[in-house]
Amino acid sequence: MSETGSNEIKQWTLEPETEYRFELDPGTSLAIKLIQGNAEVFGAELAEGKHYLFGSECKAAVFTWQGCTIEMRHPSTEYVSEETPMAAYANLHIAFEQMRVRALAKFHGSPLPPGDEPPTAPEPPRVLVLGPENSGKTTVCKILTNYAVRAGQNWSPLLVNVDPSEGAWSAPGALSIAPVHGPIPTYSPANPLGSAATSAPMAMSSNALLPVVYWYGHPDTKRNPLLMDRLIRNLGENVNDRFELDQEGRSSGVIVDTPSSFASSSTSNDHRQKLIKACMDAFRINVILVVGHEKLNVEMQRAYSSYVTVVKIPKSGGVVELDHSYRERVHNYQLHTYMYGQVIQAPPGISNATLGGESLTDLVLSPSSSVIKFEDLSIFRIGAETMAPSSALPIGATRVVSEMQPVPVDPSQPGSGLLNAVLALLAPQNPDENERYDEEILDLTVSGFLIVTNLGMQQRKMTILAPNQGSVVGKTAIMGSFEWQEQ
């Protein structure tokens, strides 16, 4: 390590297959520039001579295969590690690349080289990533996805997020899926899997994604496992529909990021197993990756190894233990980023910094505040606001409100919980009345998110914050348990 000029500017020379790890404090930012060599952040390459900006308590690492020199301004907690799991992750990528090539050859009817024929019909990788809290599952998904799109074969794998506490490309509480055509950048925990095109206003971000989003509305899968199961299967139907229309694109495969509750012994084992099975069925999984958890690996081997490949992979030593307060701050960052865009102040002396390679001005938004009548928007809550587990009900008792029942929310009623609530605005319902059904809104995708910032009881009006000025009159929205907090 060397210092150049100011104490705020440092240079690190990294040896091959080492990584520079950093953790940012609240309110700080870090600018990194690749001086020479090659480097990547979770599989996304850095361009030489360009400043990359990180903020919002980002925790990440710059890895190099062949060695490099990097310069940074305003570092926080930082160190270099010679022990990384990247060789194991690269081997996984090579194995998945072979599966993609075989699947594509099968689609085109091309013969495989002698000795390369698999014992069964070649299938693309459909990967389920499991692991406990703070194991680095999302990072593994990001690295494998980035290596696929960098392979030069025009792969566009589908990246699926079924972790409602993460939010992925939209807001916390969402489950979503998106085809990935370019490397996913890392610059803020508010955008853990990159930026959606819907949050790029003035200039389309070159790596913007177009996700399909469903609304679960809570950070914890235990809150409503039946709804989780249904939404996972809805995502699976979207995957299958896409592959029916794009048989060649099917060869790119699917990578599924999961919540830590899928590996948690504190979660009801019955619910946990059902949700894992829902993912297995919905996405037709053929590979399970277990990140650093021996007991879970044995459990998956016993349950699924007869028809899928189960692989235990190492957890990175750079994974940071995240507490509950940090996760709540990240949820707040995500909601503000959805409404106002990504706003990170560059360190002094830097005027050309980028967020994941994109200009800072391209990622700033101006949301719209508008006043609507209570009756202009139909608002529902799925199930009762508080609901005991079925096992806690008296013997023979049944619920008055089922876990899957849409319950209308009246803004004029005290205790509605609407003030500062996050609402998921749904896509239009089926115009054919004969095709309607009671729980249809559970199967509708999300077209955007709203925040209720004020309730006027006497005027029977409410103020909503939205990313744009589009009308919401006559539309339907669902509320969950997330709330807006001013920064």
Swiss-Prot record:
Give me the residues that bind ATP, please.
Answer: 19, 59, 134-139
Give yes or no: UniProt keyword Ribosomal protein: no
Biological process, per Gene Ontology: mRNA 3'-end processing; tRNA splicing, via endonucleolytic cleavage and ligation
Q: Give the primary localization class.
A: nucleus
Keyword Oxidoreductase among UniProt keywords: no
GO CC terms, sorted: mRNA cleavage factor complex
According to its UniProt entry, the function of this protein is described as: Required for endonucleolytic cleavage during polyadenylation-dependent pre-mRNA 3'-end formation.
Q: Which PANTHER family match?
A: CLEAVAGE/POLYADENYLATION FACTOR IA SUBUNIT CLP1P (PTHR12755), POLYRIBONUCLEOTIDE 5'-HYDROXYL-KINASE CLP1 (PTHR12755:SF6)
Protein name per UniProt: mRNA cleavage and polyadenylation factor CLP1
